[in-house]
């Protein structure tokens, strides 16, 4: 067992029972000896597995200086609780001394010893602290600007819709500023019930704490919640987690929520929207509490909370609603089949641009294994004719309506468009997913699907094909800075072998901070403000899907880099879609790998591009891509069945023979 010693922290705090001691801060000296097994850190070299001396010291100081204890023992107990529950310390000794207590005493003090198991099994142990707003008649000086974090749960009926309905009712008195992802979690405290849907949201309100509690209880009652037994099933459950930074403890309300620290179904959603919010009594962030969960807050196989009676591990996973159906992102890699109702798309132009043929193809895509159909009415390859918005609507809307008529309402449909007018008409016709950031419709959207306008592509300075003249229909790789790509023509590669700027071995240098810098870094930098804009416009976090836009505004090396480092994009927490299907960067990667540099890149309809697409999809699946957008369903579906069996063994669906 490793020992961590923090000696003689000098702080000033309000402590004591006499009237004068409740006003003037006194010098307090705190020493801590903590015991924790850090062998895992030594073997993994992962700093998450160790204890930050600085963070622990700051938490102790912050807690002690802001709390108003009556006794040294109460303060020592509170410090011990922070060490154990906040930092995973297994055993701790806390010495608290008060030099100015009695003139003739040498430094009267109290020393206690506590364990992590003690606090887990005695969750009722109270940390005495300054109570704010501890009566129903409290006057809040921040009325109208109160920031509140709420947790939601439902496991009866249409669980997803129940939470959405509670949002609508909540908006009568609160403004929803942001939401977490939606999670599905196993029941923890009482196992014999259905799984829960959970999320969290940040709201602003002018309601005082007890008025807000009354309002929330009214929502629960109006939605049909019936009190049965503790931790039993419920139509809707809404808990106040934080209210500003207040500490409130009355007979009917306790803020912060007393058991939030052990609940993954609270901490994971809360960390989506308030990762750095500091718990006002534990004095640690939401992220720190999440990391203190067994398994470090990972979303699979989390051991049950300490106060639960079950020994079964908890499964908690992100879900999304598309149309009337709920999808679990970890079940499989979802396949989006491409349906272009255009005369000039680079792979299938003219094949499905009549209503009869488009319906036949949509039916075939579903039969072949597509989970989503992506419908496009405007080609974006270089040189494509730019059609009017009205013509694009006339191409896609009849197809959408006919698909709904023939195939029903359960098939998710996506509209691939640059124009919000087209997106609006497509949604009204029956689409479920759009590339629209207007927020007018609360449906899932795909962000960063970097499609340049046809006019942009047709500007001569931007026609930077990484293909030969016989491959004019392939997707282009475009450098948005208007600079030459490293490999504009594969036939010239042999002439540039000695040029370091064009050497393919140097293309993955992530330290170059030039105009041609890492596309992954650009995508992450650009995604965050777009995500923030979407949430401010009223979209829920679980409705956002990221697409790095393979092949658009990129050299082929940059598209390869995205495939190499896609896991970094996954680090944003959002589901990710990739669309490598038969694109030009695949052809150029193959051509550059050929010994005979005089060979032209494979054409869009070449089988070699199909094999390249399969490779890209398998790579994306390995780092966690959730959706793949493709033309060739049967071949890639089989590849994904194998890939998912390796990469997603926890999936719950059964592979059909």
UniProtKB/Swiss-Prot annotation:
Positions of the UniProt region annotated as DHNA: 1-116
Instruction: Indicate whether Kinase appears among the record's keywords.
Output: yes
PROSITE patterns under this entry? DHPS_1 (PS00792), DHPS_2 (PS00793), HPPK (PS00794), PTERIN_BINDING (PS50972)
* Gene Ontology CC, one term: mitochondrial envelope
Gene of this entry: fol1
Q: Which parts of the sequence are annotated with region: DHPS? A: 335-657
Write out the biased-composition intervals (Low complexity): 467-509
- Disordered: where is this region? 466-524
**What name goes with this protein?**
Folic acid synthesis protein FOL1
Q: What is its EC number?
A: 4.1.2.25, 2.7.6.3, 2.5.1.15
Q: Coiled-coil regions in this chain?
A: none
Q: Which cofactor does it need?
A: Mg(2+)
Which GO molecular function terms does the record list?
Answer: 2-amino-4-hydroxy-6-hydroxymethyldihydropteridine diphosphokinase activity; ATP binding; dihydroneopterin aldolase activity; dihydropteroate synthase activity; kinase activity; metal ion binding
- Binding-site list for (7,8-dihydropterin-6-yl)methyl diphosphate: 380, 416, 435, 547, 583, 629-631
Q: Which species is the source of this protein?
A: Dictyostelium discoideum
Biological process terms from the Gene Ontology for this record are:
folic acid biosynthetic process; tetrahydrofolate biosynthetic process
């Amino acid at each position: 067992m490793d020992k961590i010693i923090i000696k003689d922290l000098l702080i000033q705090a309000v402590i004591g029972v006499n009237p004068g001691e409740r006003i003037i801060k006194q010098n307090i000296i705190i020493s801590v000896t903590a015991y924790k097994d850090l062998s895992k850190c030594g073997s993994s070299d992962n700093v998450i597995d160790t204890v930050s001396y600085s963070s622990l010291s700051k938490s102790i100081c912050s807690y002690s200086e802001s709390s108003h204890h009556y006794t040294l023992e109460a303060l020592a107990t509170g410090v011990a609780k922070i060490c154990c529950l906040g930092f995973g310390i297994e055993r701790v000794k806390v010495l608290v001394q008060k030099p100015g207590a009695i003139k003739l005493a040498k430094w009267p003090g109290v020393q206690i010893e506590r364990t992590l198991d003690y606090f887990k099994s005695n969750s009722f142990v109270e940390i005495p602290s300054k109570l704010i707003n501890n009566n129903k008649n409290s006057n809040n000086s921040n009325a109208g600007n109160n920031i509140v974090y709420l947790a939601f749960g439902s496991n009866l009926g249409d669980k997803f819709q129940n939470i959405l309905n509670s949002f609508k009712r909540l908006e009568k008195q609160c403004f929803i500023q942001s939401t977490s992802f939606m999670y599905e979690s196993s029941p923890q405290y009482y196992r014999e019930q259905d799984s829960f849907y959970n999320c969290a949201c940040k709201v602003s309100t002018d309601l005082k704490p007890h008025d807000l509690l009354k309002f929330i209880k009214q929502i629960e009652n109006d939605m049909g919640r019936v009190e049965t037994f503790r931790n039993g099933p419920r139509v809707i459950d809404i808990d106040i987690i934080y209210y500003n930074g207040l500490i409130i403890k009355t007979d009917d309300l306790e803020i912060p929520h007393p058991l939030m620290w052990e609940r993954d179904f609270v901490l994971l959603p809360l960390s989506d929207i308030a990762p750095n919010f500091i718990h006002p009594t534990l004095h640690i962030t939401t992220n720190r509490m999440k990391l203190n969960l067994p398994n470090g807050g990972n979303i699979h196989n989390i051991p049950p909370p300490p106060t639960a009676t079950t020994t079964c591990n908890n499964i908690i996973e992100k879900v999304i609603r598309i149309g009337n159906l709920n999808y679990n992102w970890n079940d499989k890699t979802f396949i989006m089949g491409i349906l272009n109702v255009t005369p000039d798309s680079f792979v299938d132009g003219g094949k499905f641009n009549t209503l009869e043929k488009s319906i036949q193809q949509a039916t075939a895509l579903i039969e072949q294994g597509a989970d989503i159909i992506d419908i496009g009415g405007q080609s974006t390859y270089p040189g494509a004719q730019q059609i009017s918005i009205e013509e694009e609507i006339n191409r896609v809307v009849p197809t959408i309506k006919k698909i709904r008529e023939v195939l029903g309402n359960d098939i998710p449909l996506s509209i691939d468009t640059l124009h919000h007018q087209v997106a609006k008409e497509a949604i009204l016709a029956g689409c479920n997913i759009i590339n629209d950031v207007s927020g007018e419709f609360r449906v899932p959207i795909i962000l960063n699907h970097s499609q340049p306008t046809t006019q942009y592509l047709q500007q001569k300075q931007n026609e930077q094909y990484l293909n030969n003249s016989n491959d004019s229909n392939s997707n282009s790789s475009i450098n948005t800075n208007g600079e030459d790509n490293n490999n504009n023509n594969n036939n010239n590669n042999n002439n540039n072998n000695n040029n370091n700027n064009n050497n393919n071995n140097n293309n993955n240098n992530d330290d170059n901070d030039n105009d041609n810098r890492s596309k992954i870094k650009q995508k992450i930098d650009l995604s965050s403000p777009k995500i923030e804009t979407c949430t401010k416009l009223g979209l829920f976090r679980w409705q956002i899907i990221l697409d790095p836009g393979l092949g658009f505004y990129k050299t082929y090396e940059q598209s390869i880099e995205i495939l190499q480092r896609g896991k970094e994009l996954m680090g944003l927490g959002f589901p990710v879609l990739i669309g490598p299907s038969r694109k030009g960067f695949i052809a150029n990667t193959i051509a550059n790998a050929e010994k005979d540099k005089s060979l032209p890149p494979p054409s869009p309809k070449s089988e070699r591009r199909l094999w390249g697409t399969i490779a890209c999809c398998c790579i994306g699946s390995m780092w966690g891509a959730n959706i793949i957008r493709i033309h060739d369903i049967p071949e890639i579906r089989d590849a994904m069945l194998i890939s998912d069996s390796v990469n997603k063994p926890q999936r719950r669906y059964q592979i059909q023979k």
